[in-house]
UniProtKB/Swiss-Prot annotation:
Entry similarity comment: Belongs to the endoribonuclease YbeY family.
Any one GO molecular function term: RNA endonuclease activity
GO CC annotations on file: cytoplasm
Binding site for Zn(2+): H131, H135, H141
Function text: Single strand-specific metallo-endoribonuclease involved in late-stage 70S ribosome quality control and in maturation of the 3' terminus of the 16S rRNA.
Keywords annotated in UniProt: Cytoplasm, Endonuclease, Hydrolase, Metal-binding, Nuclease, Ribosome biogenesis, rRNA processing, Zinc
Gene Ontology biological-process entries: rRNA processing
PROSITE patterns: UPF0054 (PS01306)
Gene: ybeY
Residue spans crossing the bilayer: none
Name under which the protein is recorded: Endoribonuclease YbeY
Entry's localization field: Cytoplasm
Length: 167
């Protein structure tokens, strides 16, 4: 079970009814099921903030010390490494619960990027959702090798949902 808490504090998000708890749960479940090590966990939790440029600017300044609006910010609750997902996850212990983390999405940046890249807003959001969930479970793109691995996994998951590669 994946419990998703969504806070929509920017009205433009309400125009996209298909971006809802059910979609987020379905995508998150698709990602987690790819890693057998998560199978013993019965309940996952994820918090989402669907917000605007002003709040993303504040979050970026506060947590990343940058003065720029970004499309998404992911705050993992656990220090996971993607390489450990393919081996034994002893650090999870006997817990059957995991809070994955918090994610904040910026409407205006996503909207502008989707227009520039000639994608639907929803498809671009789904890509960023996949990208952010992968960050929450330990994937990163600090070097070319990591970026390639993460991008290939994103492409595979997007394909499952009928969305073409953004790369």
């Amino acid at each position: 079970m994946i419990n998703v808490e969504i806070i929509k504090n920017y009205d433009k998000w309400r125009e996209h009814k298909q971006i809802n708890k059910s979609l987020i749960q379905k995508i998150t479940q698709n990602i987690l099921l790819r890693f057998n090590n998560f199978s013993k966990i019965k309940q996952f939790e994820l918090s989402m903030l669907l917000t605007n440029t002003a709040e993303i600017l504040t979050l970026n300044k506060q947590f990343r010390n940058i003065e720029k609006a970004t499309n998404v910010l992911a705050f993992p609750s656990n220090e996971l490494n993607w390489q450990d997902l393919y081996s034994k996850l002893e650090f999870l212990g006997d817990s059957d619960y995991m809070h994955l983390g918090d994610v904040a999405f910026c409407y205006e940046v996503i909207y502008n990027e989707s227009c520039e890249q000639q994608k639907t807003f929803e498809n671009h959001f789904i890509h960023l959702l996949i990208h952010s969930i992968l960050h929450l479970i330990g994937f990163d793109h600090q070097n070319d090798t990591e970026a390639h691995i993460m991008e290939n996994l994103e492409i595979e998951i997007l394909s499952y949902f009928g969305i073409s590669s953004p790369y």
